[in-house]
């Protein structure tokens, strides 16, 4: 076996750790006095639950508010720009949760900003916009998610394609890397419906004026008469006009699910490889029946019976994610991303059939043993589940 001791000496903190161990051994210590310290530190950095209080509410645009959340008890854990927290709420007796990207920079350690845009029929989003005021408290997960910039492997040409609410994670990521002086070229191609409803427009324009390596392109799809800016959608032609060559660029796509899907199609048509496209998780598909492999004859509006082994049963709509149906009927399942990524909402299908959306990050063994991610699973027949 090769001698690796000379390599270990170059690891940061290795020599100091060995010296501390040697000192402890001289006193006959068995290190029991340190038991639990690592667990305590991990719990501090990654607590299972946070208790947050709304400190401020800011009206950003006619359709959007920013909620500044501070810890109700102690410090907030650090996060990577682009990550989200899952906010738990109780609305009309229904316990549920939704993930929201943190729109503030990680350098602001005493608060998280959540920027929320109105959604047609949005159960939680519209509750936040219409009902929540300073002083209210919420439970939330710690920051999580994989949608963030990696300086080691993402290269030096970073392109953000943002639509509407996608301005929230884009703002945190772009402001963070620019403030750190990262040696790279940054592009933001930002699509919105109306010119008077652009989230963080002043912030992005100020950053573009201040930093020569940040290039901003704004596009409006439903402009008013007389609007003299760029019109249309973020199609392949618009993307290449804004960023030039797509070769070696890393793309970050953030916005509503239809926007993300459309942008990916455009990037693929330009020859961008999957590994150069990072997409923010943003909820289950709105119309699962339009997806490939949806069962022939399955009607989104149909009702099926969901039996929860040992707990009861209820009626659920085929076109509604199983997790949503469970929550509406009083069953709590741990969850975070609600996009098929984190796997916290796994349930086991004992009988019946479900449709798993492409977002579901299932393993081969999951299919073998019947596990599904309930946030992106749709019951297409009567089913029995276990969790």
Label every PLM stretch briefly.
Residues 1-31:
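Helix-rich terminal scaffold detector
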Residues 1-13, 121-307:
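FNR/FR-type flavoprotein reductase catalytic core
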Residues 36-137, 141, 156, 192-194, ...:
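Ferredoxin-reductase
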Residues 106-111, 152-156, 378-387:
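Ligand-binding loop in jelly-roll beta-barrel domains
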Residues 116, 161-162, 192, 254-255, ...:
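Small/polar loops that bind or transfer phosphate-bearing groups
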Residues 300-334, 338:
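C-terminal accessory/binding modules appended to enzymatic or scaffolding proteins
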Residues 312, 325-329, 334, 344-387:
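Iron-sulfur (Fe-S) cluster-binding segments and ferredoxin-like electron-carrier domains
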């Amino acid at each position: 076996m090769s001698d690796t001791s000379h390599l270990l000496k170059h690891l940061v903190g290795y020599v100091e750790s060995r010296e501390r161990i040697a000192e402890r051994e001289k006193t006959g210590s068995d290190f029991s006095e340190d038991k639990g310290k690592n667990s305590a530190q991990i719990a501090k950095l990654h607590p299972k639950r946070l208790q947050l209080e709304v400190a401020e509410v800011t009206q950003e645009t006619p359709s959007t508010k920013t909620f500044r959340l501070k810890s109700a008890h102690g410090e907030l854990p650090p996060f990577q720009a682009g990550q989200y927290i899952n906010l738990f709420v109780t609305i009309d007796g229904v316990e549920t949760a939704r993930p929201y990207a943190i729109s503030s920079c990680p350098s602001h350690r005493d608060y998280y900003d959540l920027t929320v845009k109105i959604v047609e029929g949005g159960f939680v989003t519209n509750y936040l916009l219409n009902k929540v005021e300073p002083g209210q408290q919420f439970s939330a997960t710690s920051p999580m998610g994989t949608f963030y910039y990696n300086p080691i492997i993402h290269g030096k040409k970073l392109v953000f394609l943002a639509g509407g609410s996608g301005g929230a994670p884009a703002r945190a990521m772009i402001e963070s890397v620019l403030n750190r002086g990262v040696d790279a070229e940054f592009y933001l191609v930002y699509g919105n419906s109306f010119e008077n409803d652009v989230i963080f427009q002043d912030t992005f324009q100020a950053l573009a004026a201040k930093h020569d390596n940040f290039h901003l392109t704004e596009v409006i799809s439903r402009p008013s008469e007389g609007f003299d800016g760029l019109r249309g959608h973020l199609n392949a032609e618009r993307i290449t006009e804004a960023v030039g060559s797509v070769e070696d660029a890393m793309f970050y796509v953030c916005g509503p699910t239809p926007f993300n899907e459309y942008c990916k199609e455009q990037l693929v048509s330009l020859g961008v490889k999957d590994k150069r496209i990072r997409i923010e998780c943003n909820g289950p598909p709105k119309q699962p029946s339009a997806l490939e492999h949806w069962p022939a004859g399955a009607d989104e509006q149909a009702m099926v019976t969901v039996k929860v082994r040992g707990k009861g049963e209820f009626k659920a709509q085929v076109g509604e994610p199983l997790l949503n149906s469970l929550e509406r009927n009083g069953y709590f399942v741990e969850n975070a991303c609600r996009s098929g990524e984190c796997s916290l909402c796994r349930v086991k299908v004992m009988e019946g059939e479900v449709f798993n959306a492409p977002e579901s990050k299932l393993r081969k063994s999951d299919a073998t043993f019947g596990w599904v991610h309930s946030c992106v699973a749709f019951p297409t027949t009567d089913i029995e589940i276990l969790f």
